[in-house]
Each structure stands twice: as C-alpha cells, then as structure tokens.
C-alpha cells in the first residue's frame, strides 16, 4: 500500500470514528467515562489494522482473532480482553446499521471465558470500622466522613459522588438528585446520618476558597475544585488500611455493600434497582447471588442438624486424638 493511500485511509477512518463517537454519545446515551473507554479500546484495533495494512471495511474473522490473540500475548487481563472485544462488536454493528458493510465479521468472534465473580462486600461492622478511623481533627476529616457516609447511605457510583451538586440536595424531603450513566437523572433517598455528616462538612467547606465554575460542587479538594475519582479511591484505601481491612476496598465496594445489606434487610429488588440506577433488573440480580451465599453460610452455621454434625465430628476427632496419644504412650513404654 502506497504512503498516500495509507494517509487517505487514516483520514477516512478519523471521520468514521468521529461519526461513531457521536452515535455512542447521542443514540446510546453513554456517559463520558464509558465513551472514553470505548474509544480507547477501538483505537487498539485501529492501530493493529494500520500496522497490518488491513482496510477497516475488509476485516475478516481471522484478522480479528489474530488481534484478540495479540491482546492475550501482551498480558491484557481477560476481563479487559472481553471488554475490548465487546466494544469492537459494537463498532461493527454500527457499520452494518449505517450500510458501510454488508456482513458482520465479529459475529463468530469470541472473547475469553470469564468466570462469574461475586464482588467484595463489607460487613456492617467493617463499614463502621472504616468510617470510625477518620480523624475529625484533621483538615479534611469531616469531608472524608461525609463522603463515606454518602457512598454507603446512597449506593452511589464514584463519578456520581464527585459530581454531586449543592443544588441537588433535598434534605427536607430526604433525597438527593443524581446524574448517572448516560446523563440519566434519578432521585435517591439519603439517610439522616449522612445528612448530618454533610451538614457538618458544609461548615468546613465555607472556609475554602472555591475556584470559578466549582461553586455548586458539594465535595471539594483543598484547591477549591471538585474531587477526582482517584482522590476518592485514595481516601477509601487509606481508611480501610488504617482499619485493618484485608479485603480489596474501593468506592464500588461501598456500593455493593449498600445493595447487599438492603437485600439482607428485606428490601425489594426492584427498589434497589431504582436506587442503584440499573437499567436492567438482571444487573441488580447479582446481589441475590451474594445473599444466597450469606444464607448458605447462615444455614451452615446455625441449622440444628449442622450444629449436631459439627459436634459429632469434633467428638470423633477428639476420640481419635485420644486413641493416637494412647498408642504413642504404649510405644514409649
């Protein structure tokens, strides 16, 4: 392929990618973070096609399988591989819809098999332990406590938390307004305890020199801008380490714990779906798996037959230990 042809193809691809980006943004209503992830993943495929001198409209299943094998070879995590392949499938469905191609080369493309993994969940005691380690005497102490109480009280995504606005707090009614994925808004109940911690934080917030355009953001950095997601990750990691929690704790762990504890307490699954902002009930149903595990451990721990079985096994072990020690004593004589 001549150099000018390469350049021409690259320019055409840029226009096409821009059109696809608009499609995801407007028709699929993806959030900016999800959109960025889609485009970054697609860029990996485009770089591969450019390197292999393959036209984007003439890609075959073999080409895509070679690309997928390359992801594995360079050590990309299986979950990330699956996400990238899912994004590529979305791109080629778009090409079909807009009549750029007639058949879908990704139809038989498979990603790596991903085992079902339940998310980490904190117990109520672990949540209390993490929050209680926050020193209110420190400069950002009250802010950090308000952040953790809000995450646990409302089950927010970290991006929803960092984008919370003062104008979206309806404390008299006991709700906050949240902008979730795809710019979809929802009202989420907030607990009296979280309201109390936020109100205490607002006193500290009033002393911050707030930068222009950030006046309405609830949670601010010491520089007077809204907190980044990374900052919230660091706050939670630090407090979990101080509390001696060995689990892999993140903002999303608080969200998982919120949903699981509600379900354990008897909350309706549909209500939990609304609070989490899940489009599909199947996404929320992951928490029924967590609840089943909890129920199983409760049955193993407390069912009378299991208690009796454990007692019998313990007695047998003690009898065997006694017999073994008796035999050893005889040998020693």
Residue map of PLM features:
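Conserved catalytic core of the tyrosine transesterase superfamily
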Residues: 1-333
């Amino acid at each position: 392929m001549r150099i000018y042809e390469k350049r021409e193809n690259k320019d055409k691809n840029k226009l096409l990618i821009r059109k696809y980006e608009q499609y995801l943004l407007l028709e699929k209503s993806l959030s900016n973070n999800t959109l960025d992830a889609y485009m970054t993943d697609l860029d990996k495929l485009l770089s591969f096609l450019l390197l292999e001198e393959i036209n984007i409209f003439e890609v075959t299943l073999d080409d895509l399988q070679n690309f997928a094998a390359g992801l594995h070879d360079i050590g990309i995590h299986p979950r990330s591989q699956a996400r990238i392949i899912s994004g590529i499938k979305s791109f080629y469905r778009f090409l079909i819809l807009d009549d750029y191609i007639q058949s879908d080369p990704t139809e038989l493309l498979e990603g790596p098999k991903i085992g079902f993994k339940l998310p980490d969940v904190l117990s109520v005691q672990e949540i209390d332990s993490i929050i209680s380690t926050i020193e209110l005497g420190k400069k950002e102490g009250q802010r950090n406590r308000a952040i953790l109480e809000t995450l646990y009280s409302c089950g927010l995504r970290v991006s929803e938390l960092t984008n919370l606005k003062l104008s979206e707090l309806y404390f008299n009614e006991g709700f906050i307004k949240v902008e979730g994925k795809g710019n979809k808004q929802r009202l989420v109940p907030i607990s009296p305890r979280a309201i109390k911690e936020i109100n205490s934080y607002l006193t500290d917030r009033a002393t911050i020199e707030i930068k222009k355009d950030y006046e309405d953001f609830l949670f601010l950095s010491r520089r007077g801008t809204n907190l980044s997601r990374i900052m919230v990750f660091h706050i939670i990691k630090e407090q979990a380490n101080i509390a001696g929690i060995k689990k892999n704790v993140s903002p999303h762990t608080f969200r998982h714990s919120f949903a699981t504890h509600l379900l354990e307490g008897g909350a309706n699954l549909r209500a939990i779906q609304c609070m989490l902002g899940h489009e599909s009930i199947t996404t929320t149903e992951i928490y029924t798996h967590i609840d089943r595990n909890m129920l199983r451990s409760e049955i193993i721990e407390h069912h009378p037959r299991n208690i009796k079985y454990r007692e019998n096994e313990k007695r047998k072990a003690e009898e065997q230990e006694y017999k073994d020690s008796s035999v050893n004593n005889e040998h020693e004589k």
